[in-house]
C-alpha cells in the first residue's frame, strides 16, 4: 500500500524554516515584508552597515530560530555589536547556525496569524485569522478569533498576501502565515 504524506513538501519546509531564505522568496514573490537585511554575507561589518541603513530600533533574529530564541531588540548603534554577538552565540547553541537576519523593529505589534490551506493541484485559500498578540517570552498565551481589530478590507489584503506566500513555495496542506501589524 502506498502511503501519501499530507502536508508541505520537504522543499517548502526547508525554505520556510530558514528566515533568510524565506524572506528572500517572499520579497521575490511580491509579498509585503518588514524592511531589513537577509543577505548571505554575515560578517559583523556587513551587518553593522545594514543596521545603520535600516535604522533603530531593529531586531536581530536567528535565521533558523523560533520561539524568540536568538532574537535581540537593539535600540541604538552603541548596543548593536554586543547584541549581535549574543544573538549569534545563542543561534549557534540553539540551532547550530550562525546566520542572522535584521529587521526594522515593530514595537508593540499585533501578532495576527492567517490560516491557509493548499491542495496538490496548486489551489490555495485563506480560511480566517486569529490574534496571537498576548505573549510571554515570544510564546503565545492566548489566541483570539476572529481578530478584534480586523476590518473586511484588511482581512482580504492579509489573506491574499498569505495565499501569495503559500503559492511562492508550492505549499500543500494546512498552514499559517504570521503577520505583524
Segments from the language model and where they lie:
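N-terminal beta-alpha lobe that positions the nucleotide/phosphoryl donor
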Residues: 1-177, 181
Amino acid at each position: 500500500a502506498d502511503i501519501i504524506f499530507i502536508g508541505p513538501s520537504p522543499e517548502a519546509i526547508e525554505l520556510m524554516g530558514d528566515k533568510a531564505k524565506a524572506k528572500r522568496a517572499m520579497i521575490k514573490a511580491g509579498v509585503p515584508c518588514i524592511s531589513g537585511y537577509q543577505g548571505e554575507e554575515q560578517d559583523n561589518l556587513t551587518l553593522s552597515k545594514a543596521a545603520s541603513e535600516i535604522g533603530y530600533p531593529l531586531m536581530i533574529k536567528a535565521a533558523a530560530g523560533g520561539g524568540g530564541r536568538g532574537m535581540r531588540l537593539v535600540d541604538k548603534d552603541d548596543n548593536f555589536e554586543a547584541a549581535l554577538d549574543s544573538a549569534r552565540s545563542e543561534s549557534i547553541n540553539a540551532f547550530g547556525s550562525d546566520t542572522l537576519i535584521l529587521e526594522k523593529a515593530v514595537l508593540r505589534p499585533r501578532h495576527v496569524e492567517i490560516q491557509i490551506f493548499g491542495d496538490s493541484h496548486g489551489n490555495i485559500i485563506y480560511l480566517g485569522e486569529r490574534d496571537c498578540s498576548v505573549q510571554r517570552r515570544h510564546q503565545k498565551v492566548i489566541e483570539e478569533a476572529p481578530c478584534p481589530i480586523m476590518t473586511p478590507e484588511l482581512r482580504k489584503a492579509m489573506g491574499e498576501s498569505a495565499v501569495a506566500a503559500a503559492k511562492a513555495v508550492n505549499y500543500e496542506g494546512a498552514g499559517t502565515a504570521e503577520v505583524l501589524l
